[in-house]
Amino acid sequence: MRLVLLGPPGAGKGTQAAILSDKLGVPHVSTGDLFRENIGNNTELGQEAKSYIDAGKLVPTSVTVNMVKDRLSQDDAADGFLLDGFPRTVEQGDELKNILDGLGTKLDAVLQFDVSEDVVVERMLARGRADDTEEVIRTRLKVYRDETAPLLEYYKDSIIRIVAEGSVEDINERTMEALKALDS
């Protein structure tokens, strides 16, 4: 299965992706991990990304797209993947379509993890990170909503909504049921 996971920070995408990766036997491709790997391995793309990060600038979409393209071209992603953190914009959605066209494949679905703002704030405050104040979290949620709203419209025919509240197990059960329905 080739899936994109969408949802606000704190929706549990990473947690669900790890479980789904195990159950479906496909890699969890997180853009955060891709950045860390490329920078850590001192690849050409990693060096380019690091130069922007060190200067306090956003890494250009082209660099992220190339990292994703490289990763999705690897053998373990041939039968599927779970994309987490990409795409974030309609422009990146178009880029992903181009990557997949080049690989002769397409997305099976976009999983949108729906969770209330209050639950996200509660979860993120519980993590106990110093930079996770309620104000910072609510700002991140607003940025997510503003950035991602057009993407939800872009993928409207592919979206499967998952209620991402309750236990990790309950959310995973709902996700697996939705994917089984997609497969039948």
UniProtKB/Swiss-Prot annotation:
It is found in: Cytoplasm. GO terms for cellular component: cytoplasm. Pathway: Purine metabolism; AMP biosynthesis via salvage pathway; AMP from ADP: step 1/1. InterPro entries: Adenylat/UMP-CMP_kin, Adenylat_kinase_CS, P-loop_NTPase. Transmembrane segments: none annotated. The keyword Transcription does not apply. ATP binds at G10, A11, G12, K13, G14, T15, R127, G166. One of its GO terms (biological process) is AMP salvage. Catalyzes the reversible transfer of the terminal phosphate group between ATP and AMP. Plays an important role in cellular energy homeostasis and in adenine nucleotide metabolism. Consists of three domains, a large central CORE domain and two small peripheral domains, NMPbind and LID, which undergo movements during catalysis. The LID domain closes over the site of phosphoryl transfer upon ATP binding. Assembling and dissambling the active center during each catalytic cycle provides an effective means to prevent ATP hydrolysis. This is Adenylate kinase. It comes from Corynebacterium kroppenstedtii (strain DSM 44385 / JCM 11950 / CIP 105744 / CCUG 35717). The gene is adk.
